[in-house]
């Protein structure tokens, strides 16, 4: 991935261009990287909130200082998703190199304490957990941590493996290759199987206290098997992704060029960019015939199902994001559309 941060002149241009979308309600700061590492992150959040947008963001939690927490609250940020992949400090350090679990938990508690002092409900705290072979034993412990920090939701996602080594950590199931998930994986999908597989307590709920009322917390599990049902939340929710350099992409999965491994198959994804807000308006980009046609194809999911095709091991199309129906890019084996990899 190309590293960088959006300069404020470009951000102000984006903010002005968003006025062309009167039905736009939410702006989410996330993707690949840490939003709060931006040198003007808090100013960006304030400007978005002042413009009337519901703001949410992902963070690893290390930069949620007391000053940052106060800004998040005062700006009316709706949800903060904290990435926590373990409740064990040693496991956490292996996954989040350079991070300290105690520091992240302390930062969450500071945020919650400030909310209480200021008598406000937002931002809600959600814990995001990337499920892997090496931390699967930590998943049943997440509801307890969520209860302690006042989080009403634990959002679980599978790993997007960028290398063969990372692929060894994958737990979701692939047709014809039912690793540890068991022979009955296709016959027993859903929550019941998730509880059985990962030893979560039943029922998985906890009280998340917010001032004068109580929300019942829950774990939102990802899909753990490959299936024929596919849905793109990015397209169906009328979302677009704007990179730090102003480039516009339909989704996280196509915003950069990168390798990943799927069913022991190396795949190269090429970025799919429809334009750049620095040189043309987001409204014009959104209404380009190419973009309109792409959204139509994805809404109707006019793509083959590559993963359960008997010839996929000998198909050159599957090595890149193309397919035998002539789609380029192709969303045929997108992990997001399967609900296997999930984003807020």
Predicted feature locations:
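Structured loop/turn residues at beta-strand edges in well-structured enzyme cores
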Residues: 22, 75, 149, 304, ...
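Radical SAM enzyme [4Fe-4S]-AdoMet core and its adjacent flexible, acidic
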Residues: 1-2, 6-12, 51-54, 74-280
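Flexible mid-to-C-terminal extensions adjoining Fe-S/redox cofactors in radical SAM and related proteins
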Residues: 247-248, 253-344
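Short hydrophobic segments within beta-strands
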Residues: 30, 58, 128-130, 309
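Short beta->alpha connector loops
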Residues: 35-36, 60-64, 86, 131-135
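Conserved Radical SAM active-site core
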Residues: 1-56, 62-75
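Short, flexible helix/strand-to-coil boundary loops that buttress conserved ligand/catalytic motifs
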Residues: 15, 68, 96, 252, ...
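Short glycine-/acidic-enriched loop or helix-start segments at secondary-structure transitions
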Residues: 38-41, 67-68, 91-92, 166, ...
């Amino acid at each position: 991935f190309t590293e960088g941060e959006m300069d404020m002149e470009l951000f102000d241009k984006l903010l002005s261009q968003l006025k062309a979308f009167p039905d736009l309600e939410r702006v989410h700061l996330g993707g690949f990287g840490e939003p709060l590492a931006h040198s003007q992150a808090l100013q960006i959040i304030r400007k978005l909130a002042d413009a009337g947008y519901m703001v949410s963001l992902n963070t690893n939690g290390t930069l949620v200082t007391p000053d940052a927490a106060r800004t998040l609250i005062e700006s009316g940020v709706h949800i903060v998703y904290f990435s926590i992949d373990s409740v064990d400090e040693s496991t956490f350090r292996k996954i989040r190199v350079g991070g300290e679990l105690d520091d992240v938990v302390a930062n969450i508690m500071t945020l919650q304490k400030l909310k209480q002092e200021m008598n406000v409900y937002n931002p809600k705290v959600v814990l995001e957990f990337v499920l892997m072979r090496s931390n699967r034993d930590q998943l049943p412990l997440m509801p307890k941590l969520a209860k302690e920090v006042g989080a009403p939701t634990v959002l679980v996602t599978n790993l997007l493996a960028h290398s063969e080594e990372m692929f060894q950590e994958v737990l979701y199931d692939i047709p014809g290759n039912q690793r540890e998930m068991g022979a009955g994986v296709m016959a027993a999908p859903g929550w019941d199987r998730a509880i059985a597989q990962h030893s979560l307590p039943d029922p998985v709920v906890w009280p998340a206290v917010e001032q004068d009322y109580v929300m019942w917390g829950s774990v939102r599990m990802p899909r753990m098997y490959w299936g024929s049902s596919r849905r793109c939340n990015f397209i169906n929710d009328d979302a677009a992704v704007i990179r730090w350099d102003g480039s516009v992409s339909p989704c996280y999965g196509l915003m950069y060029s990168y390798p990943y491994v799927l069913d022991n198959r190396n795949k190269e994804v090429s970025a799919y960019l429809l334009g750049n807000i620095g040189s043309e308006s987001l409204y014009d980009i959104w209404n380009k015939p190419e973009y309109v046609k792409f959204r139509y194809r994805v809404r109707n999911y006019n793509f083959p199902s590559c993963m359960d095709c008997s010839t996929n091991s000998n198909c050159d199309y599957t090595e890149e994001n193309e397919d035998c129906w002539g789609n380029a890019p192709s969303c045929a084996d997108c992990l997001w559309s399967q609900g296997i990899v999930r984003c807020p």
